[in-house]
Amino acid sequence: MARLKEKYLNEIAPKLKEELGVANVMEIPRITKITLNMGVGEAIGDKKVLENAVADLEKIAGQKPVITKARKSIAGFKVREGWPVGCKVTLRRERMYEFLDRLVSIAIPRVRDFRGISPKQFDGRGNFSMGVNEQIIFPEIEYDKVDKLRGLDICISTTARTNEEGRALLKAFSFPFKG
């Protein structure tokens, strides 16, 4: 069992139940999935760029990403409908907890000039989204083999109903929030 899943079941869930004052165990907020998305606009001109992005995301997530295609043609961006424009991967269960562990304990501390995560990154329903500017903060990516620094979006979906519940959940997982 993943270290953070064990911590959630044994420590975080009972603490949140008491803190939030919920009667039913199923009402305790929990993380349902983590989605990693890498938009690669340069993939239009060069297919090799997308292959490198897919390889990087596969190393970071530990599973094969799916290639996302453009939904609409946009002349300003020189994009046609159906062209590959990025890749994404959805993590659930064990892999999700293992990624979360690496994110909180290894990757976030390696971010340059890091001053904490803004609490404004919640969507109003307890889900949390953050952007990472460089994929090299993850230990799986070797700096010498990176062709270009790419960022990625990390979206953490929870069963929390409000931002406060979501923040309490992620704070219990030792997310470094500001203030």
Swiss-Prot record:
Upper taxonomic lineage: Bacteria, Pseudomonadati, Pseudomonadota, Gammaproteobacteria, Cellvibrionales
A GO term from the CC aspect: ribonucleoprotein complex
PROSITE patterns with a match to the protein in the record: RIBOSOMAL_L5 (PS00358)
Function: This is one of the proteins that bind and probably mediate the attachment of the 5S RNA into the large ribosomal subunit, where it forms part of the central protuberance. In the 70S ribosome it contacts protein S13 of the 30S subunit (bridge B1b), connecting the 2 subunits; this bridge is implicated in subunit movement. Contacts the P site tRNA; the 5S rRNA and some of its associated proteins might help stabilize positioning of ribosome-bound tRNAs.
Xref: Pfam families: Ribosomal_L5 (PF00281), Ribosomal_L5_C (PF00673)
Transmembrane annotation, as ranges: none
Family to which the UniProt record says this protein belongs: Belongs to the universal ribosomal protein uL5 family.
GO biological process: translation
HAMAP family assigned: Ribosomal_uL5_B (MF_01333_B)
Keywords attached to this entry: Ribonucleoprotein, Ribosomal protein, RNA-binding, rRNA-binding, tRNA-binding
PANTHER family assigned to the protein according to its UniProt record, in alphabetical order: 60S RIBOSOMAL PROTEIN L11-RELATED
Protein name: Large ribosomal subunit protein uL5
Molecular function GO labels: rRNA binding; structural constituent of ribosome; tRNA binding
Subunit organization: Part of the 50S ribosomal subunit; part of the 5S rRNA/L5/L18/L25 subcomplex. Contacts the 5S rRNA and the P site tRNA. Forms a bridge to the 30S subunit in the 70S ribosome.
Gene designation: rplE
